[in-house]
Amino acid sequence: MIQIIPAIDLMDGRCVRLTKGDYGQKKVYDGVPADLARQYADAGVQRIHLVDLDGAKAGEPRNLRVLEAIASAVSCQLEWGGGIAHSEALQAVFDAGATHAIAGSVAALKPELFEQWLQRYGARMILGADVRGGRIAVRGWLEEAPLSIEDLVRRFLPLGLKESIVTDISRDGMLEGPSTELYVRLQSAFPTLSFTVSGGISSMEDIRSLDKAGLQKVIVGKAIYEERITLKDIALWLQNA
């Protein structure tokens, strides 16, 4: 069964959600991030998706204290993205408690550096590919690179890449359903790579459809905050996995 990965997006140490990656369309949610992470872990999730939105914009991690607090609160895997622009930042993220690191802008703009990270950290590195109109968006989705997700995968797959999170920016935060056909096409083209669906999840029915399509992982964010998907829903799904 498809693995559900709840998301916690961070700005100024708080839980937020953007719409289509627009920093001007921000909604702040109540609650302490570490407490929310603990609720997810209690529901039985194996991994939590953490995004440092301040870091993505600044090019440096900005919410590492929150990561430390979450890592102290839960024992599940933590994947972290945002602001990982150089090796010192990557090491700081791992030191703060992340089990996996997501590199998007570096993979697109400094591929030689991402290759070094793959060689050093192996499966702990995740390729983050944020797609808008078929092109890769970088630096907090504020710019675009003249590359496709296929270009990136073909480059890094021979070097040991195991996972890629692909976000369809046009669906992100919209609660309109995922771009299932995109992920099915990618999974078919690169069967040895584990693709994570990100963007648009609005209901458990979306998740069931992705599962039937043979996809392996899905990130759920706004649908949980807006109570379209409950922690009970997630717990029941995981119990049946």
Where are each of the predicted segments found?
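Structural preference for beta-strand elements that scaffold enzyme active sites
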Residues: 3-7, 47, 75-79, 99-102, ...
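Active-site-adjacent beta->alpha loops and helix N-cap segments on the catalytic face
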Residues: 3-4, 55-71, 85-91, 105-126, ...
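Short secondary-structure boundary segments
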Residues: 8, 52, 105-106, 129-131, ...
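Conserved anion-binding
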Residues: 13, 19-24, 91, 98-172
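N-terminal beta-alpha supersecondary unit
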Residues: 15-61
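Short, acidic/polar
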Residues: 29-41, 85-91, 144-155, 207
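Non-catalytic positions within long, well-ordered alpha-helices that form the structural scaffold/packing
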Residues: 41-44, 94-95, 157, 211
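Catalytic cores of alpha/beta
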Residues: 74-100, 181-220
